[in-house]
Amino acid sequence: MNIGIVGTGSIAHTMAKEFARPTTMPVVAVCSRNADTGIAMAHEFNIPISKVYTEYDEMLADSEVELVYIATPNSLHFEQAKAALLAGKHVLCEKPIVPTVAQLDELLSLAEERHLHLLEAITTIDHPNYGLAKLFAKEIGDIKTVSCTFCQYSSRYDAFMNGQTPPVFDPAYCGGALMDLNIYNIYFVVGIFGDPKAVHYYPNRHANGIDTSGILILEYPNFVCQCTATKDSSAHNSAQIIGTEGSILIEPGSNNCQKLVVTRKGKEPYISEISDTPWRYEVIGISNFLIVPQDTVKERRIRAMRSAVAVLEAARKDAHLDF
């Protein structure tokens, strides 16, 4: 399925490298507001210069483009995804796909009406070790606590502290630690345990209102989950599920389930280490789904997507983040 990419930031380049591996998803076009960055990306990934667009509508009119990969600031996702679906294109949108459940439901309805696929690009759900974690979570007894940490000092934080406002720290672009990083922790948790019964978010705010870091609490009937994400500091990242009969440890965190360690009473530890990039498995999972779109896989993806967006929306409401 031929891909047109909108956006030329770091994640667009990362995904383009994965698409460039032998897959069924070649990149045939790129759209950037800046022609120079679009041309540079075209040269890097052997995209014809004639397929470099500075107007999104022009790329959507390109009949060779079958799927649009959206890698732009969060606040642009809804309108760009809607336009792509209306143009008859499948959509793969970077996380978080949209800020609200209402927007997501509108896009899902539109995709269903037009027999198109709407997918969210996130590394967690297609990683083999995450699949193992879901299975082993049933073997460690009653769950008592869950904790996920994704702390990553942003490459744009110093500029932000010096008076600039990059999109990742701009409320107008739906930036911040919750939307950018805690989304991985949310996906990790809801994909295993389903919807929480209550959501609370405790952010550290900058003067402009953005959350540069924060702790998200997800309450389940029999346990509480803590999800920590920071863009203003760094730490050792991991995801841990602790039960009465054992525990599951994922490192280096919910966005990259590279190492899985399972300990169970009376059994030898189970360890799985995977060296390939998490984006590799993301692209493989998406590619396999598009080749053979099974209803059960589609339903699971939609359920996880909707649960994650619902948590994001509830967390922002709880913390009075007005975007």
Question: Model regions: which residues?
Answer:
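Beta-loop-alpha module in the N-terminal Rossmann-like domain of NAD(P)-dependent dehydrogenases
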Residues: 50-108
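C-terminal helix-rich "cap/oligomerization" subdomain common to oxidoreductases
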Residues: 67-69, 105, 285-323
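Hydrophobic residues in well-ordered beta-strands that form the structural core
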Residues: 93-94, 118-120, 250
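Contiguous beta-strand/loop segments that form the cofactor/metal-binding neighborhood of enzyme cores
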Residues: 185-255, 284-293
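N-terminal Rossmann-like dinucleotide-binding module
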Residues: 1-46, 290, 321
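Predominantly a Rossmann-like dinucleotide-binding segment in NAD(P)-dependent oxidoreductases
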Residues: 127-197
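Short, conserved SAM-binding/catalytic segment
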Residues: 40-49, 106-113
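Rossmann-fold dehydrogenase core element
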Residues: 106-124, 142-145
